[in-house]
């Protein structure tokens, strides 16, 4: 029997940075969690995200978060992430309205200023490339603004900070 105390969804979100601005997206009003709020692209890890792939060692799959985030970014906002290194920003746990706990890991990546255009999936209704000041004008899910602050300070000073209000 599985111990429900040990079960969590694992969610990876991404802060995409282009020309010093962050990509934020608005959730559809019909979404179960945080309807109509502004957030970051990302999604849940599923077993099929790795088990159909060849293992990287005899026992393990590597880069699972990175591969998941690349797929979710392509599905949700139509941007293809080619190569690149994701950086860790923050992690948190959230209990959804349906009582399922979610471990959320937030990563960031700078993307080139190329010809790719954002194309939203049906679960998202709007997007913005926003700097910190512009992000204040959007109804962000609580805590996301602080994640953007952490990343902004890291980009400007090289200092890595922990999340805090």
Where is each model-derived feature located?
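Acidic, metal-coordinating catalytic segment for phosphate/diphosphate chemistry
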Residues: 1-13, 30-31
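NUDIX/MutT-family hydrolases
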Residues: 108, 118-149
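Active-site-adjacent beta-strand/loop module that shapes the phosphate/pyrophosphate-binding cleft
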Residues: 84, 90-117, 151-154
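Short secondary-structure junctions
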Residues: 77-84
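Conserved Nudix-box catalytic region and its N-terminal flanking loop in Nudix hydrolases
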Residues: 21-75
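Charged phosphate-binding loop/patch that engages nucleotide di/tri-phosphates or the phosphate backbone
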Residues: 145-165
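Conserved beta-strand and immediately adjacent loop positions that scaffold enzyme active sites
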Residues: 13, 21, 126
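A cytosolic small-molecule/anion-sensing beta-strand core signal
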Residues: 18
